Design a protein with these regions (language model features):
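Bacterial N-terminal signal peptides that target proteins for export
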Residues: 4-16
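General secretory precursor processing signal
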Residues: 7-10, 31, 117
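Bacterial Sec-dependent N-terminal signal peptides
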Residues: 22-46, 666
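Acidic/polar surface patches and capping/hinge elements
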Residues: 42-666
Length: 666
């Protein structure tokens, strides 16, 4: 009988609506005397095609990036938001793929269980996937950004997308047992929300620090306050007190900002493992550190010369921000990019960074490997290029923060007409939704691990920023010659044409004899020289070192967390290597990516640039390396913070992609 029914089913599938005559029944083992039976095959289900243009996952990623731009500047928290929402969308998508495995849905993570129940899958899965994805993303955005300063705009954008997709904003059902995609999306969102309340981020208390306290009182920065008289420890982070301070998202903060996320190493990571972790106890708190890079150079340690060299290099590179100094650079991939290796010790840094002229030992490329043509030269003033880099990669006020910036780059890569969306560069070309879901999941996990690792290190080592160190060393004097005035072993090292002593005939001493013997720097002159940033430039010249400023907005100056290791370097190298892994090539589509900069219509800190230019990168790593250097020109990081971040980012990308692949292959 079973054989008979199988044959009957096969025949119906082949012929559709038929009359089962005795001959057909006989062929299936039926009796010839049976009367004719009419059986109607249901019409084939019409499968919904992929939508043209952006996938639903991409639409929600754009809403999330908008939300980040309108929230407080919290790169750690937004890396987590990007990961959790990308992962929730992946879970909602994978439920409808019988052989796929989700990340949190149906699993247990760090003691939190998100149980799952089986239900009958529809034949036409795409509409259900889109609906579940949308409700999952919508509910988490709704929860995570409810107290954002831009919450009205954020929720208006999220509501508008839901309504444009034809979804009911008020359906909060969680019972998906009968196959409701709405309930499934809500349930997955609920899992991530509950998981986020106990993952170590301290979300219930608005991510507040539980133990960390700064050892240094705030450095007051204003036109009338000079030097750094309040610092107690030149190795440790110092808060900044700035009138009218705004965070990286442009939100005004009336009090001296606290250290953002020094305890972030406690947060449940993605692919980081206990094998990568070291625990350090300070002031009764256990700092969890992944990929520990070791102690940075300290002012009174065996590496004191590296300490002074690194921070003095930051002040010297500040002199490169002058469009009128006559220095011209080829900024094309013909001359920039293609770094083969990094220094492996602090003592080797001086061989990697070009202290006087700026930049690194990159060699560029002979040919574009895609077109087999040489890259065209692009000659521009160094002072324009360095300022553009400092602002392009700043991810400062009103930006999507560094992890979000790399999602923007990912989206640009995905949009490129020459990209073949083959996962890891092999196999079938994926549809837009599957590509976006998988790439967001991979990038989200990688950015989250970068935040957990970098900020765990920041909290543990609590390292000083350039604006604090340079001003503090300037107050002490010069450390080069005991026979010269103002000698102090921990002062700034003298460098002719860059770091010098103020003499009696110096213009800085004209009418101000109290400045004789102080340290002066040839550097960007600071925001006091810019009244109208649309039309004026501070320029580069000799200033008192006690008045040195980073190339930043006067009401922002420096991010409110420790420098070592650089978050930008960690995020960027991890993202770049991840992009190489998921696309299967080190190169951007077409062998180069570009960003157009229009003369006198790009810079925000001051007027410029004086010429139009195109930022160009041959490979993902070239973009990452450029981002790292930009933070030195911007006065935010010394080399000490940079290279360890790059090395750690590369390790994170490897582990993250391995975990992603193992999940996809299950």
């Amino acid at each position: 009988m079973v054989k008979y029914m199988m044959c009957l089913k096969k025949t119906i599938n082949q012929l559709g609506a038929i009359i089962l005559t005795s001959s057909i029944l006989a062929g299936c083992g039926g009796g010839s005397a049976s009367p004719p039976v009419v059986v109607t095959q249901p019409p084939p289900v019409s499968l919904t095609p992929e939508r043209e243009g952006q996938s639903v996952a991409r639409m929600w990623n754009e809403v999330l990036l908008l939300a980040i731009r309108n929230d407080f500047a919290r790169p750690t928290i937004h890396a987590r938001n990007l990961f959790h929402i990308s992962s929730a969308m992946f879970d909602a998508w994978s439920v409808y793929k019988p052989r796929a495995k989700g990340f949190l849905f149906g699993n247990e993570l760090a003691g939190f269980a998100c149980s799952s129940s089986d239900f009958d899958l529809p034949i036409d899965i795409l509409p259900h996937q889109e609906q579940a994805i949308s409700y999952a993303a919508y509910r988490i955005i709704q929860h995570r950004f409810i107290f954002s300063p831009g919450s009205v705009q954020i929720m208006a954008a999220a509501d508008a997308l839901m309504l444009s997709l034809g979804y009911n904003l008020d359906d909060e059902s969680l019972d998906y047992a009968q196959g409701s995609a709405v309930a499934l999306g809500n349930y997955i969102a609920d899992c991530y929300i509950e998981f986020g309340l106990q993952d170590g981020a301290n979300e219930p208390k608005f991510y507040a620090n539980t133990s960390y306290q700064p050892v240094n009182p705030p450095l007051v920065l204003s036109s009338s306050d000079v030097g750094n008289p309040s610092i107690l420890n030149l190795d440790r982070w110092q808060p900044l007190s700035i009138e009218g301070f705004v965070d990286q998202a442009g939100n005004r903060i009336d009090e001296a900002p606290t250290f953002l996320s020094p305890e972030w190493g406690q947060v449940v990571p993605f692919a980081l493992s206990d094998n990568d972790k070291t625990v350090f106890t300070r002031d009764g708190f256990d700092y969890q550190v992944y990929h520990d890079p070791g102690m940075p150079p300290l002012i009174d340690s065996a590496l004191s010369e590296q300490y002074k060299w690194g921070f003095s290099l930051v002040s010297m590179w500040s002199s490169h921000l002058d469009q009128n100094d006559g220095v011209m650079w080829d900024i094309s991939p013909k001359s920039i990019g293609n770094i083969s290796e990094f220094p492996q010790s602090f003592e080797e840094f001086s061989e990697f960074y070009k202290q006087l002229e700026g930049g690194d030992p990159s060699t560029g490329y002979g040919l574009n490997p895609i077109t087999n043509q040489p890259y065209a030269e692009q000659i521009v003033p160094r002072g324009d290029y360095t300022r553009v880099l400092a602002e392009f990669w700043a991810d400062g006020p009103e930006s999507e923060t560094p992890p979000g910036h790399w999602f923007v780059i990912l989206n640009a890569v995905s949009d490129h007409p020459l990209l073949e969306k083959r996962w890891a560069g092999v196999g079938d070309i994926l549809g837009p939704l599957e590509w976006d879901i998988k790439s967001y999941f991979a990038m989200g996990g990688t950015m989250h691990d970068s935040a957990v690792a970098a900020w765990g290190i920041k909290g543990r080592y609590d390292y000083v920023r350039p604006v604090s160190a340079i001003r503090a060393m300037a107050d002490l004097g010069q450390s080069s010659d005991p026979l010269l005035p103002s000698y102090h072993i921990n002062g700034l090292p003298l460098m002719e044409n860059y770091i010098e002593l103020v003499t009696a005939t110096d213009p800085l001493a004209n009418g101000n004899p109290q400045h004789i013997g102080k340290i002066k720097l040839y550097a960007w002159k600071g925001p006091d020289y810019v009244i109208d940033p649309l039309t004026e430039q501070a320029g580069v010249g000799w200033i008192l070192a006690e008045q040195w400023w980073p190339y930043q907005r006067p009401n922002f100056v420096t991010p409110s967390f420790a420098g070592y290791v650089s978050g930008h370097s960690t995020y960027s190298r991890a993202a770049a290597d991840l992009l190489e892994s998921i696309t299967g090539t080190a190169y951007f589509p077409g062998g180069m990516s570009e960003f157009e900069v229009v003369a006198n219509n790009f810079l925000v800190f001051e007027a410029g640039p004086s010429v139009s230019m195109t930022l160009q990168w041959a490979t993902y790593q070239d973009a990452s390396d450029q981002c790292s250097l930009s933070r030195i020109w911007g006065g935010i990081h010394p080399p000490t913070d940079d290279i360890p971040g790059r090395i750690i980012g590369a390790k994170i990308a490897i582990d993250s992609f391995e975990l992603v692949q193992s999940i996809f292959e299950q």
